[in-house]
Amino acid sequence: MTKKELIDRVAKKAGAKKKDVKLILDTILETITEALAKGEKVQIVGFGSFEVRKAAARKGVNPQTRKPITIPERKVPKFKPGKALKEKVK
């Protein structure tokens, strides 16, 4: 499902204007992104949680030179589904 399709479905279910739903969705995504950038964990009960975790440094290969390289440790966003979401997906 694309963002546009999500907006269409939510607008139809809620009986709201697509423009309003888009603004709300954009604001939610921006707020989650800002919180993660600050290192905060975002929990939505019944849905799941978003957090930033560290990905350990690892060995890799430079695709242009084929020489071994070390890929440095980095921060990556992670999503952990909540119990209710897991149950619905089963």
UniProtKB/Swiss-Prot annotation:
Listed Gene3D superfamilies: IHF-like DNA-binding proteins
Region described as Disordered: spans on this chain: 57-90
InterPro entries: Hist_DNA-bd, Histone-like_DNA-bd_CS, IHF-like_DNA-bd_dom_sf
Swiss-Prot/TrEMBL GO biological process terms: chromosome condensation
Molecular function terms from GO: DNA binding; structural constituent of chromatin
Source species, domain of life: Bacteria
A GO cellular-component term linked to this record: cytosol
Record's keyword terms, sorted: DNA condensation, DNA-binding
Regions that span the bilayer: none
Pfam families, per database record: Bac_DNA_binding
Family statement: Belongs to the bacterial histone-like protein family.
PANTHER family, sorted: DNA-BINDING PROTEIN HU, DNA-BINDING PROTEIN HU-BETA
Function: Histone-like DNA-binding protein which is capable of wrapping DNA to stabilize it, and thus to prevent its denaturation under extreme environmental conditions.
Identification of the protein by name: DNA-binding protein HU
Organism: Thermotoga maritima (strain ATCC 43589 / DSM 3109 / JCM 10099 / NBRC 100826 / MSB8)
